[in-house]
Amino acid sequence: MNIHEYQAKALLGEFGVPISKGVPVLKAADAEAAAKALPGPVYVVKSQIHAGGRGKGKFKEASAGDKGGVRIAKSAAEVSEFAKQMLGATLVTIQTGPAGKQVNRLYIEDGSDIDKEFYLSLLVDRETSRVSFVVSTEGGVNIEDVAHNTPEKIVTFSVDPATGIMGHHGRTVANALKLSGDLAKQAEKLTAQLYAAFVAKDMSMLEINPLVVTKQGQLRVLDAKVSFDDNALFRHPEVLALRDETEEDAKEIEASKYDLNYVTLDGNIGCMVNGAGLAMATMDIIKLYGMAPANFLDVGGSASKEKVAAAFKIITADPNVKGILVNIFGGIMKCDVIAEGVTAAVREVGLSVPLVVRLEGTNVELGKKIILESGLNVVPADNLDDAAQKIVKAVKGG
């Protein structure tokens, strides 16, 4: 689960992390008062969407002006003017895709006099089963570009969960950022604070880009992006309360109600598969034959007829879907359950696109019989390669 920047900063502030003063705004009419509540005289008006690249992004609407999603204002009146332009407008960034995202919230933040910019993040390293730090002197830019062009400017290290954060970890961060004296002490303190927040709130990723040194000699978190482990949300109701469903795909929200692993993609072939590995292989072979998947959907190994039917409805609700491929290898998952779920869903919502079904494994003959006797227009497939070729051909009208 992701949260907005202003929510992330408020959470980090509870752990003593140095952040600038700011006020979230939902209505343009409140923007000027929000600015006047801050020290000023310079303010930053930040679009709050779940996507990066806001500063370099562009709004679709001409009425929003030609500036990006993060704007510098020199007065409270200018803050108000920016708010009127930005709220309700559609911001397109490198991470939103061409459709963009509507800006429904702004964060009015006190301006900072910046001397240096750094990059600092924490994430769960699945290879070491530890929390890892990624640190770089190159802040305010895409860390992927830094990793590609100047990897020597990135320092990484992990923290042993048995010992937790220790003094030498903070010194490693300070050294990586080439900080000394009081700034080094601030970096050591910040390292401990961030680790404490990360572990206490079951985060999966915490990215600060940039972490800045102000001209007054203070470290400050200028931007923060936080993701949480969905499997741990049950013990963090205060975090779950921060969820903004308007920032999420409606189909993904619906899928989560049935414990389905669903991710919207930008292709035209809907996929229903059991098992993440088989799902990825299915998407790969669709690409191999010249088309792209419309989604990743893993129904899991213990899906019921109702769960399968719900999954099928979610796929058909996507207007971009021009064909559907069901690819099931029944181990724990039984092929007859898949067949019953698919046929029930088709009877309820109808079927206006080609459907190719490949079943193999437990109760496969019974599953094929259910589909055959349903009278539905389903194209059977013998194996994955055959299934991929058939759905691509059907969608292309071959």
Swiss-Prot record:
A GO MF label: succinate-CoA ligase (ADP-forming) activity
GO biological process: succinyl-CoA metabolic process; tricarboxylic acid cycle
Cofactor(s) listed: Mg(2+)
GO cellular component: cytosol; succinate-CoA ligase complex
EC category: ligase
Keywords, ordered alphabetically: ATP-binding, Ligase, Magnesium, Metal-binding, Nucleotide-binding, Tricarboxylic acid cycle
Residue ranges of every copy of the ATP-grasp domain listed in the record: 9-254
Keyword Metal-binding: yes
Bilayer-crossing regions: none
Free-text remark on how the cofactor is bound: Binds 1 Mg(2+) ion per subunit.
Catalysed reactions listed for this entry: succinate + ATP + CoA = succinyl-CoA + ADP + phosphate; GTP + succinate + CoA = succinyl-CoA + GDP + phosphate
Amino acids binding ATP: 46, 53-55, 109, 112, 117
Binding site for Mg(2+): 209, 223
Binding, substrate: 274, 331-333
Pfam family, one: ATP-grasp_2
Pathway: Carbohydrate metabolism; tricarboxylic acid cycle; succinate from succinyl-CoA (ligase route): step 1/1
Family according to the record: Belongs to the succinate/malate CoA ligase beta subunit family.
Protein name: Succinate--CoA ligase [ADP-forming] subunit beta
Species this protein is from: Bradyrhizobium diazoefficiens (strain JCM 10833 / BCRC 13528 / IAM 13628 / NBRC 14792 / USDA 110)
